[in-house]
Amino acid sequence: MSTEAVARIRLEVAPSADLLTQLPAAFDTTGSVSVTCLPHHGPGRTVEASVNLASLGYHTVPHLAARSITGEAELHSLLLQLQQAGVSELFLVAGDRRKPAGPYAWSGQLLEAVNAYSTDFSIGIAGYPEGHPQLSQEQLSSSLEIKAPLASSVVTQMCFSAEAISRYVRTIRKGGIELPVWVGVPGPVSIRKLVSLGARLGVGRSLKLARGTGMAGALWRRDDFLSYDSGRLIREVHQELAGDPLFAGFHVYSFNDLGRVPGLMDDLRTLQPTTTLAPGSTSIPLSPAKI
């Protein structure tokens, strides 16, 4: 079997109590893992989990939510912990907290503060192929333009439409954004969970399309209960973007449904090979292609 890379994968997880024992059984410790920052957890829990995962060998990318950080002292403490653990990449978001805990009301302010502390971190910023439920397209475009000069990559919100993803990448390229793009796709997860998240994340449009077209039989399957099969979406996106040198890879939203991750990894081995690897990504070795 060839070891040529066919897909570049980053797995998003939440810092749950059993993550350190469950994740290595599902995802190789040489892989890349993005760790969320939820309002009820706070950034400290994200950083602690990221440090612990890094000690196992993972390339960890902690999320830092601007609205959850109390100020410069806490930010510097968090960044120092990450530096000491060898963590060199971050993903910055505004976060879902309604009232900011400190001076950082949006991710642009946090981005500037991190860069003022150290320019050694690679920093990802968010992209929204289907827009944002609380922001206009003009606001999103302006935000991206402001943050891009200090950022290292764009990570897109979860989307169920290869067409919407490709269109978004083309649009930001035309707008002068030449950052590598990690394409956010759902992992194999229950439909009930996806539907409950759809409206909040602003992805209801492509979720409805995926369920309501002739693709339904290929996109949705019944195991013990109805679940989403992301294999076809990943193939379609890969076919569209594999030749783009700034296509960083797939950012897979696992929702900590880790038992299904090995099956997804097996499925990704059927993709046609790409030519380069992005920093902080996991390569999947080549098997005979099924497409």
Q: Positions of the model-derived regions?
A:
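Non-catalytic positions within long, well-ordered alpha-helices that form the structural scaffold/packing
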Residues: L80-Q83, K147-A148, R173, G243
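Conserved beta-strand positions
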Residues: V35, L92, I125, T156, ...
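Active-site beta->alpha loop and helix N-cap motifs at the rims of alpha/beta catalytic domains
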Residues: M1-L140
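Active-site glycine- and acidic-residue-rich loops that bind
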Residues: I69-E72, R98-A105, T156-V169, V189-I191, ...
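Conserved, mostly hydrophobic/aromatic
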Residues: P62, L82, K147-L150, V183, ...
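Active-site glycine-rich loop that binds ribose-phosphate moieties when present
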Residues: Q134-V154, A164
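Active-site pocket-lining/capping segments in soluble small-molecule metabolic enzymes
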Residues: L11-A17, G102-P129, E178-A242, N256, ...
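Charge-patterned, long linear interaction tracts outside catalytic cores
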Residues: K147, F247-G263
